[in-house]
């Protein structure tokens, strides 16, 4: 017996009465007509799987046998005689009476058949590999249940896309490789009866509402296949009253099922069922999106099914079941009524639910990515949460530190750039008062907005000077401070940057009117006054501004002239006779001599002014000189020559280049010669010291390099350089 599967039918070849040798040798079996097959249409034909073959092997015997009590084995089936009983005649008459009903069926309805042939079973392994059983419910259009007779039963013509496979297409398979070889030995009668009863329980007593979930377990697949066959019990149960005959041992124990449609001629009922079935089937097909491909072993045209020729082979001995048209209609209508229940349970979910599920899935994917990134450094650590937090904290700190480091580097670069500019300004060769006034801070005992301080401030505001009030100072005095951010390095003869701070300048200015100064001299208190000022401005050079000397002597002369005029006008004898110098106790000459004495004895710088405006101008000038004094002071102790400041060597842009440009002024001294001498002597004093020590030919062996060759300076140029710097034998300078 061989099993052939398509999307629309399952064809099972029944056993033959011949042996293996006879089946292989007889070529007449190739043309066995389709009428020799027992055809049963089923609702759902699950695709075959290798796990389900064992189940099919157990009940793959013919439906009709010569015995009424036992289920014959394949080998016993081959020895059945061709005797027809009364029951067979009854079935044939019933089949012939129902032919007219069969022809009235709708030809467009889909019919799937199970073909039971009387040929020997082939090996299951010889079937095509692409034909597999899928253990899930396959919704299809309801079909007709039909049992074809050998002679008188008509055959239902299938659809255009359905072909019936040749039952003997694989006749070369041996009987020894058949799954039915386990039935070679005839079992006892009781065992066969038990098998028949158990098969009936499996096929007919299964719940109709069971569904077929898809599982991978072989046991589950077997059970699902049983359910798939028996869940369509509506196909077989209406047939039980007609099939339950003495010749059918397999279905003899089935209980009688009442007919669901007693009025079988009513076309309205069938049309109503067809409409309902059509709607439910469309819903199921849209839900499952099933596509079926029909694989045929031996395609046959529908015309072959209409003409059936009798066969004279050994298979005539088998008694075949007639086709029951009424039962097929009942099973089809019964299944149509049950389809909407399945379709309701398999409705597609709404679009909103799928959209929400998709959004949730996207969120889960994002969360998984975040978790995998955060846990990446600590995949093997058990304390994941604690490590993760520590890692995040360290990551934040590292990022913060990186930002701080980058900012520090940027600030350091900016500071270096700024410092380099400052150093260039500080080490500038030529410096002016205006450039240095921004470093000065002026201190006064009174408010700078009062009296003559306001005049000083108005003139120094444009130089960015600072003004501070210091109440500890004497009246009409000014002191200076400097904001310093560099230090002079005597070894390199350059200023270097340092921390900015304030330092007091060693200068103090005292403003004194000429009338007060003469009063101190007349009262012999001038020395005491200057000692007191030196103590208050200790460590500072005192600057004295005598304000109003010309005005004082002018007013004194005017006073004497007024007294003389008053005496003459009154007629009295005038007190003054001769020159005015006879009557003046303090003259200009005496004042000048006292100023010179105080300046030498007390080391005081004394200067005179006519009024407050001139005093303010003097203070501005003193402030500029004090601002420049620091740089002049350090320039005296440096090894830099003063020729650049004076302007003797105009081409020297820097002090270090002064010697080079001085040598170039000498006749026949080229830039290469000057560079060679400057490589050995970095300053003018060092060159002069060398010439004085080693004589006039001390530069003879100086190597002069050019792009072509090297040579020595020679004695002639050595003597010329010696005479130029030491001013000896000027006549030898001539070429």
Curated annotation (Swiss-Prot):
Keywords: DNA damage, DNA recombination, DNA repair, Endonuclease, Hydrolase, Magnesium, Meiosis, Metal-binding, Nuclease, Nucleus, Phosphoprotein. InterPro entries: EME1/EME2_C, ERCC4_domain, Mms4/EME1/EME2, XPF_nuclease_EME1_ascomycetes. Residues 245-268, 289-363, 375-397 are annotated as: Disordered. Pfam families: ERCC4. This is Crossover junction endonuclease eme1. It is found in: Nucleus. GO terms for biological process: double-strand break repair; meiotic joint molecule formation; mitotic intra-S DNA damage checkpoint signaling; reciprocal meiotic recombination; replication fork processing; resolution of meiotic recombination intermediates. Residues 289-331 have a biased composition (Polar residues). It comes from the Eukaryota. The keyword Repeat does not apply. Its cofactor is Mg(2+). S.pombe appears to be critically dependent on the mus81-eme1 endonuclease for the resolution of meiotic crossovers. This may be due to the absence of an alternate pathway for crossover resolution such as the MSH4-MSH5 pathway which exists in S.cerevisiae and other eukaryotes. Disulfide bonds: none annotated. Interacts with mus81 to form a DNA structure-specific endonuclease with substrate preference for branched DNA structures with a 5'-end at the branch nick. Typical substrates include 3'-flap structures, D-loops, replication forks and nicked Holliday junctions. May be required in mitosis for the processing of stalled or collapsed replication fork intermediates. May be required in meiosis for the repair of meiosis-specific double strand breaks subsequent to single-end invasion (SEI). It comes from Schizosaccharomyces pombe (strain 972 / ATCC 24843). GO terms for molecular function: crossover junction DNA endonuclease activity; DNA binding; metal ion binding. The modification Phosphothreonine is found at residue 400. Its main location: nucleus. Belongs to the EME1/MMS4 family. The keyword Transmembrane helix does not apply. Interacts with mus81. Residues 467-691 form the ERCC4 domain. GO terms for cellular component: Holliday junction resolvase complex; nucleus. Its EC number is 3.1.21.10.
